[in-house]
A protein has these predicted regions:
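Short beta-strand elements in bilobed, periplasmic/extracellular small-molecule ligand-binding domains
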Residues: 32-52, 134-140, 195-201
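N-terminal basic/disordered segments at the start of proteins
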Residues: 1-37
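Cap/lid and interdomain-hinge subdomains that line or gate substrate/regulatory clefts
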Residues: 2-9, 101, 105-222, 226-234
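C-terminal catalytic subdomain
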Residues: 289-424
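Long, internal scaffold/assembly segments composed of regular secondary structure
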Residues: 222-313
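Short, well-structured alpha-helical segments in soluble
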Residues: 57-70, 86-89, 248-258
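Periplasmic-binding protein-like
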Residues: 70-79, 98-100, 262-267
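Extended hydrophobic packing segments that form well-structured cores
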Residues: 371-493
Length: 493
């Protein structure tokens, strides 16, 4: 996928001066051997400088990993470690940092070979807090070479999201639609996250679209679309307009991303879009999202931000859906009950008009926006990509600056069930354990909008760490709590 950072982690071993430097160096070598044997060499770099209680060593290591092109850092305590210089390294490194430490290897070498990194990690964490330095520390940060190799690998998607956010520009078109206050987007928190935003009017976009009339690239783009749609190409007459619109967006990105490397788009799709452009943009949105450029509907700025984070974490296509409607009783009784271990309240339908990428649908068909067509001519509502969403594991999540301009987030893992929806749009039957309680005491209670981002797989662990790292307070980092774990607002009776 394009529009994603490549992560390269610089691994720097550190050593307390009253411990053998060789202990840290040899443990670093063992860590790198364990990592490269299991995961390869692409995403890591072994820094030859071991920091031994020295700010000069720290500067040398910093320069070395910069020269090697590292954009993420792993500080590895091979022994107790030098708490000042090791945390200064994280302070001066321009990128996400993690701290891990070496466990003792054998009962037969607990004199000269004992490193005490278990103790050193405590001092490291204290010094990080003193200096207000952000760092990712895994759940069990002290481990064997093999265990630390796994921790290092788990850091890659976390680092990719953090690096991506630091170089992201969101491009929005138009204000949110009338009567859609839920999609309000206080932008202060975007700047706090290091994200840039360029806000444009629909008129700017319409002008750019008209300037692409007759663009010589349109026929080739139409052929791409025809190949993707195959037998589902039921509205071939709208493809030239959709191709023109896709070229407009791609050209806008190149002309407007400025000094930023990555882009996400919050686009308008109603109420005037379809009457003026002559189509709905859903299919084009799905195609760009498949390229790694998330495009949200209804000018949902934090929606496309959430999609971008999920794209970074999963390195895969995501989507944005309405948490939309209940599953009818008869459908639950006939197709779910007794076949899957979910209550009726655990299930719901996630839907959007047609913005989910074709690779995430069981089959796809180019259609028209049925809801809009109730009040508009059908021909101006063409452009939706419809089909049931692929069954399998999912993570439903969202990062949001709510009406009070505070950062909040939620994460809930579940699945799309292999049950036909018998409905329209891009839609699936979702099942999330304890969804009913989560819906009431997180989504409603904490004023989240009706849009949720969907990653195709279970990525809750990495997303949770990303949200913590970027500053979401843990009391506002919500998840679907299991039975017996009451929400603060939940009635215990």
């Amino acid at each position: 996928m394009s529009n994603l950072p490549e992560v390269k982690i610089g691994v720097v071993a550190v050593s307390r001066d009253c411990f053998p430097e060789s202990l840290s160096v040899n443990r670093r070598k063992a860590l790198m051997k364990a990592y490269t044997e299991k995961y390869g060499t692409d995403s890591v770099y072994e820094c030859p400088v071991c920091i031994v209680e020295s700010e000069i060593h720290m500067v040398q290591a910093l320069e070395d990993i910069k020269k090697a092109g590292c954009n993420a850092l792993c500080v590895y305590l091979g022994n107790f470690g030098p708490e000042i210089s090791e945390t200064l390294l994280a302070k001066h490194f321009d990128g996400p940092a993690m701290f891990i430490a070496a466990a003792e290897e054998t009962q037969n070498d607990l004199v000269g070979g004992r490193g005490d990194a278990y103790c050193g990690m405590l001092n490291a964490s204290y010094n990080l807090k003193l200096r207000n330095i952000k760092a990712y520390i895994p759940e069990n940060p002290v481990g064997t070479a093999a265990e630390c190799a796994d921790m290092l690998h788990e850091f890659i998607p976390i680092a990719r999201a953090i690096v991506g956010l630091s170089d992201l520009k969101i491009i929005s078109f138009g204000p949110r639609p009338l009567n859609f206050l839920a999609c309000n987007a206080p932008i202060k928190q975007l700047y706090n996250l290091g994200v840039e935003i360029e806000e444009n009017s629909e008129l700017d976009l319409f002008e750019a679209f008209k300037k692409h009339d007759g663009d010589e690239r349109i026929p080739a783009k139409v052929k791409e679309m025809e190949a993707e749609l195959g037998a589902g190409n039921h509205k071939p007459e709208v493809l030239p307009k959709l191709a023109q619109y896709e070229l407009t967006l791609l050209d806008w990105i190149e002309a407007h991303k400025g000094y930023r490397k990555y882009v996400a788009i919050a686009g308008k799709c109603w109420p005037a879009f379809q009457t003026q452009f002559g189509f709905v943009p859903c299919y084009v949105n799905s195609r760009l999202t498949g390229m790694g450029i998330p495009v949200s509907c209804e000018v949902d700025i934090y929606g496309c931000l959430s999609e971008f984070i999920g794209t970074c974490v999963s390195a895969d296509t995501v989507t944005l859906l309405d948490i939309n409607n209940t599953v009818p009783d008869d459908m639950y009784e006939e197709s779910i009950k007794g076949k899957f271990n979910y209550t009726h309240n655990d299930t719901f339908m996630g839907f959007h008009c047609g913005n989910t990428n074709s690779k995430k649908l069981t089959s796809c068909n180019m259609k028209y926006q049925m809801i809009m067509a109730r009040t508009l001519p059908e021909e101006v509502t063409q452009g939706t990509l419809e089909g049931d969403i692929l069954p399998g594991d999912i993570t439903f999540y969202r990062l949001q600056s709510t009406a009070d301009s505070k950062l909040r987030a939620y994460i809930a893992q579940g699945e799309v069930l292999p049950v036909a929806t018998r409905s329209f749009g891009g839609i699936g039957i979702f099942a999330i354990p304890e969804m009913g309680r989560f819906y009431r005491h997180v989504l409603i209670e904490k004023n989240f909008p009706h849009h949720g981002a969907v990653a195709f797989g279970h990525f809750g662990k990495a997303l949770y760490e990303v949200f913590k790292y970027i500053g979401v307070p843990v009391e506002d980092l919500n998840f679907n709590q299991p039975k017996g774990m009451l929400y603060p607002t939940e009635n215990p009776f």
